[in-house]
Amino acid sequence: MDWQKITEKMCDFIQEKVKNSQSQGVVLGLSGGIDSALVATLCKRALKENVFAFLMPTQISNKTNLEDALRLCVDLNLEYKIIEIQSILDAFIKQSENTTLVSLGNFAARIRMSLLYDYSAMKNSLVIGTSNKSELLLGYGTIYGDLAYAFNPIGSLYKSEIYALAKYLNLHENFIKKTPSADLWENQTDEADLGFSYAKIDEGLKALETNDEKLLKILDPSLIAMLKNRMQKNAFKGKMPEILEI
């Protein structure tokens, strides 16, 4: 892939969305992971200024992720704000009768979304998305949480391609080497949740997307079954709410 042209196209896309909406800039959640780090880097290249980063950890958030996110803010000279959301999460736990790790993770994602949109309104800015194509196809995200945003410059890149672009743009090796994680609970990792590495997941997703029957026959049947199940079960996450026509 021609990463120079792709980078230019992404930066043009960001500039166009901000200009056409008559916004001042963009707001994003910076987790310390590679996806949000890449989007922050692209925003800085595209806009130069008015890129606002929110770091919103809980008490179980990986401290290394916070350190990496802070370092990136300094390196890119971003305006940023740290908001500890544990107190909000604790209030939810007190009111809920049956909290699980998944429900807590989803609620944390929706807290972050609410804070981003509140700040974006205050700053007349757009919330920018950080989900990659692998996550979007699988519905691996929280509806009205991290899947809520005005636009997304990296949603056409598979996770494996995210790494390639990050290397091209010289992102710090900490982002490239760390294990992918939504950091929803302690020691949580994407690949443990999904049951396969992103390399295998992307291979399967590409085979399904292109209907490569030859490749589909030799791939792990349990991988293909998992992908199809998640794509079907979570397809609603990528659609607007249906409205009855009368």
From Swiss-Prot:
Pathway: Cofactor biosynthesis; NAD(+) biosynthesis; NAD(+) from deamido-NAD(+) (ammonia route): step 1/1. GO terms for cellular component: cytoplasm. InterPro entries: NAD/GMP_synthase, NAD_synthase, NH(3)-dep_NAD(+)_synth, Rossmann-like_a/b/a_fold. It is an enzyme of class 6 (ligase). Deamido-NAD(+) binds at residue 110. Its EC number is 6.3.1.5. Mg(2+) binds at residues 35, 135. GO terms for biological process: NAD biosynthetic process. ATP binds at residues 29-36, 130, 159, 181. GO terms for molecular function: ATP binding; glutaminase activity; metal ion binding; NAD+ synthase (glutamine-hydrolyzing) activity; NAD+ synthase activity. Keywords: ATP-binding, Ligase, Magnesium, Metal-binding, NAD, Nucleotide-binding. It catalyses: deamido-NAD(+) + NH4(+) + ATP = AMP + diphosphate + NAD(+) + H(+). Transmembrane segments: none annotated. Belongs to the NAD synthetase family. Catalyzes the ATP-dependent amidation of deamido-NAD to form NAD. Uses ammonia as a nitrogen source. Homodimer. This is NH(3)-dependent NAD(+) synthetase. It comes from Campylobacter jejuni subsp. doylei (strain ATCC BAA-1458 / RM4099 / 269.97).
